[in-house]
Amino acid sequence: MDTAKLFVAGLLGGVINFFLGWLVWGILLMDYFSSHTTNPQVARSSENMVFWALIGGNLVFGFLHAYILYKANVKTPASGAILAATISALVTLGSNLMMYAQYDLLQLSIVLPDVLASALVSAIVGATIGWYYGRGPLNKTV
């Protein structure tokens, strides 16, 4: 296992996941999710956000993507996007349905947009990691 390549891919995936998550859930879908949550007061305000945990969680997802794509021998952006989006959609759908069943936090109308948003973000993360894994040596001569 090329741990250096896996480490760089994990960092790359985590950083991209963080910024895309901020854009998608923190800006684009924030109002929709707030209006379809059963208790919006449980969400932390920007001032009370625990950023070390947010950054850590995004890095974990970046390394998870990097590890799965490494083990699947992904070497192209397209194959990385497809595999990452598929896994993300399934994990998000499963976890959202279990949360809906057990907690009074969200309405069912949140599930599909969240699954689609997660798949989109993961597709971009997976495409980037697939590109990184498939690129040739940097010192190639012509």
Model-assigned labels for residue ranges:
Residues 1-142:
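Juxtamembrane/disordered regions of integral membrane proteins
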